[in-house]
Each structure stands twice: as structure tokens, then as C-alpha cells.
């Protein structure tokens, strides 16, 4: 019988692609979800998953032993569940609550994995945010690698209502919790963190554009008619969600002793997105923001070479990612 993988948060953007990648490579999948309506929406687009995937409801990832039942009998755990704002417009989630959900959710997933003797590896979906924070605090030209850590602290996050700051500290502390758990408990399994930047690509887990996660919401604003001219870029590196899913699959069995991998498809700016959208979907030129003419707005670099060397990853071109993301969002909005 093929090996069984537990994915937390399977109704989310990242985890739904993770499940698709695992199924395509012959793994059995068990996924946790929080809300029935989100699972129903996912299954409308993937009805075959009703028979292919086991689903376990976990209403609160902070509850004691939240994932213990879900982890019974599994060979691997991918912790992808996260609580983060869908967008930057009201109503927003309490940023202080997000901090504690991130930490406790990760620890509970680790506790469950440690109680299941079959588990070989635990993969945590961290973030580039755990490396650098909401902005580059390390100076112009810094090259971020697996050695870097966001310098912002829990106290700074708790004293701030800045949602992006809180999110970056969430990801840092969630990942720190993973490394600390391993150091403290020396479990049988190996734990690996993946640190992706802004995650883009096609969406298939939703029924409308009303509940997009942050990264796809950001992308949607550039092509839906909100802006006449693209705003200045605030995010400078991306990865295709399908490449991140492949990274998770490879991280389960790769021959590596590393516990952290920077994941990145490369640098981009907002003009790159709108130029691709205009090239492939000229019928929506009145909705797509015009390029703003930025040259090189990013003042840092991200080195993802370890993921290529140790995990054997290849990253697809940005044009493919942006084209497929644009097409899927227009279809989701009923425009194609």
C-alpha cells in the first residue's frame, strides 16, 4: 500500500495544490479542514477527491491534541494550515490572535507527529517572511539565505496593529517552534521548513473571488479594474504554488540533512504581472492596470540554490505562472 501523508489545512490555496501533487505521485492523502463550507467548495472542483482523499475536521488547531487523531497511521506530515487575513481590507482578523494560532498550531501538529511512530518527516510551510520580515532590515544588496532570521520579536508584534508585521512574526515564531521542538524532544522524524515568498498561480479550491487568500487577492487587484496604473511594487519575489507543492513532495524523501530551504521562483515587479496579462488577455485591457515603468524596485536578493541542489527543484518561468494565475482568476470571476 502506498504511503499516507497528512496535510493540515487542505482547503487552502497551498495545501490543495500539495494534495494534487501528492495524489499525482501515488501517495495517499489525509487532509484536515476547519469549515465544512470550504471543504464543500473544494469538492465541487475536485469531486473525485471524495473517494481519493480522507478528510478530518479540526475546528480549532489550538485545542489540546488537535491533530492526534488525524495523524494516526500516517507516514509523513505537511503542516500547511495557517490563519492569515484574506486581504488588506476590513473586516480583518485580530493580528494578535494570529500570532498564537501560528505557534500553537505548529506545536500541536508536531506533538501529533511525535505520537505516531510511523512518521518519517515533518514539513512545515514557513515563509520568506521568517527570513526578512515585512521589509528589508538588512541593508541594500543583502542576499537572503537559510541562515537569515526576521529580527522582529513577539513583543514588537504584540504591541503593533500592523497586520503584515504580525504575519511575518507569525511565520517566524511558527518555524522557531518547530526547530525548538526538535531540539527539545529529538523525535524519530526529521523536520524541514520551506520558506517561500509571495505564492502565486492558478486557483482551484474556491467558488468565487470573494475569499481569495492574500497573495491571490493582491494579484487580482492588478487585473480586475481597481487600478488605472499599477501601484509601486511592495513584494519582490514569488514562487508558483505548483512548484511549492512539488517542493513539499520532494522534501518528504530527499536525501538531505538540512532543515530549512529557501524557495523562490525569482524576482518580479507589478509591471511583470500586468504585462503578461495584457499579452495573453487583451480583451480585458480596460481592467488590467497599465505598467508604471518601474525599473528595479527591489533592494535585496534571495538565494534559493540549496533547494535546487538538495531537493532537485526546477522553477517554472514567471510568464507561465502569471498567465495561468490570470486565466484562473478570470474564470473564477465568471469572465472566461
UniProtKB/Swiss-Prot annotation:
Residue(s) carrying Phosphothreonine: 153
Record-level Gene Ontology MF annotations: methylglyoxal reductase (NADPH) activity
Binding positions (NADP(+)): 38, 167
Transferase recorded as keyword: no
Enzyme Commission numbers on file: 1.1.1.-
Alphabetized Gene3D superfamilies for the sequence: NAD(P)-binding Rossmann-like Domain
Name of this protein: Putative uncharacterized oxidoreductase C1773.04
Organism: Schizosaccharomyces pombe (strain 972 / ATCC 24843)
Amino acid at each position: 500500500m502506498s504511503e499516507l501523508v497528512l496535510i493540515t489545512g487542505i482547503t487552502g490555496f497551498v495545501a490543495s495544490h500539495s494534495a494534487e501533487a501528492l495524489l499525482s505521485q501515488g501517495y495517499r492523502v489525509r487532509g484536515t479542514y476547519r469549515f465544512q463550507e470550504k471543504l464543500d467548495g473544494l469538492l465541487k472542483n475536485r469531486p473525485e477527491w471524495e473517494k481519493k482523499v480522507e478528510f478530518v475536521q479540526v475546528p480549532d488547531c489550538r485545542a489540546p491534541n488537535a491533530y492526534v487523531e488525524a495523524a494516526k497511521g500516517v507516514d509523513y506530515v505537511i503542516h500547511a494550515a495557517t490563519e492569515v487575513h484574506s486581504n488588506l481590507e476590513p473586516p480583518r482578523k485580530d493580528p494578535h490572535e494570529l500570532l498564537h494560532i501560528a505557534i500553537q498550531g505548529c506545536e500541536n501538529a508536531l506533538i501529533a507527529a511525535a505520537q505516531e511512530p510511523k512518521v518519517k518527516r515533518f514539513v512545515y510551510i514557513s515563509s520568506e517572511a521568517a527570513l526578512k520580515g515585512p521589509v528589508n532590515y538588512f541593508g541594500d544588496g543583502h542576499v537572503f539565505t537559510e541562515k537569515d532570521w526576521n529580527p522582529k520579536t513577539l513583543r514588537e508584534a504584540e504591541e503593533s496593529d500592523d497586520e503584515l508585521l504580525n504575519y511575518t512574526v507569525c511565520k517566524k515564531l511558527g518555524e522557531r517552534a518547530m526547530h525548538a521542538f526538535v531540539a527539545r524532544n529529538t523525535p524519530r522524524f526529521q523536520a524541514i521548513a520551506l520558506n517561500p515568498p509571495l505564492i502565486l498561480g492558478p486557483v482551484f479550491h474556491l467558488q468565487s473571488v470573494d475569499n481569495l487568500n492574500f497573495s491571490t487577492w493582491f494579484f487580482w487587484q492588478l487585473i480586475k479594474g481597481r487600478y488605472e496604473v499599477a501601484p509601486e511594487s511592495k513584494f519582490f519575489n514569488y514562487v508558483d504554488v505548483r512548484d511549492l507543492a512539488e517542493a513539499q513532495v520532494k522534501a518528504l524523501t530527499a536525501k538531505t540533512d538540512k532543515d530549512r530551504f529557501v524557495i523562490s521562483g525569482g524576482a518580479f515587479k507589478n509591471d511583470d504581472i500586468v504585462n503578461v496579462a495584457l499579452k495573453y488577455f487583451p480583451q480585458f485591457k480596460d481592467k488590467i492596470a497599465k505598467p508604471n515603468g518601474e525599473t528595479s524596485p527591489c533592494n535585496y536578493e534571495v538565494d534559493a540554490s540549496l533547494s535546487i541542489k538538495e531537493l532537485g527543484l526546477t522553477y517554472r518561468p514567471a510568464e507561465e505562472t502569471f498567465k495561468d494565475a490570470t486565466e484562473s482568476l478570470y474564470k473564477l470571476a465568471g469572465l472566461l
